[in-house]
Swiss-Prot record:
It comes from the Bacteria. The lineage of its organism: Bacteria, Bacillati, Actinomycetota, Actinomycetes, Mycobacteriales. Keywords: Secreted, Virulence. Forms a tight 1:1 complex with EsxT. Complex formation results in induction of alpha-helical conformation and stability against chemical denaturation. Elicits strong humoral responses. Induces significant lymphocyte proliferation and up-regulates the induction of TNF-alpha and IL-6 in tuberculosis patients. Pfam families: WXG100 (PF06013). This is ESAT-6-like protein EsxU. Belongs to the WXG100 family. CFP-10 subfamily. InterPro entries: ESAT-6-like_sf (IPR036689), T7SS_ESAT-6-like (IPR010310).
């Protein structure tokens, strides 16, 4: 039973969430890159002029945002992994301190 003032963390869950975030991030990136590839492959003979230029602007902005999303999701997964490692280490340090203090009794 844990007390209300204790820190509890499920390290396996943290690692799992980081891995799932990475996997989904790669899936999203692949889908977005496939879409950009299809849109970039539309020949100029299909459409042109101002509409094509504006559409290309939208595609460029969308591509930039999808790249930003990829980097942000990657940073989130890295942060989760870092937090898991830091919390695990802190727990081990605290356990050693408690064991040492108990040995002095």
């Amino acid at each position: 039973m844990s007390t209300p003032n204790t820190l509890n963390a499920d390290f396996d869950l943290m690692r799992s969430v980081a891995g799932i975030t990475d996997a989904r991030n790669e899936e999203i990136r692949a889908m977005l890159q496939a879409f950009i590839g299809r849109m970039s492959g539309v020949p100029p003979s299909v459409w042109g002029g101002l509409a094509a230029a504006r559409f290309q602007d939208v595609v460029d902005r969308w591509n930039a945002e999808s790249t930003r999303l990829y980097h942000v999701l990657h940073a989130i997964a890295d942060t989760i992994r870092h937090n898991e490692a830091a919390l695990r280490e802190a727990g081990q340090i605290h356990a050693r301190h408690i064991a040492a203090a108990g040995g002095d009794l």
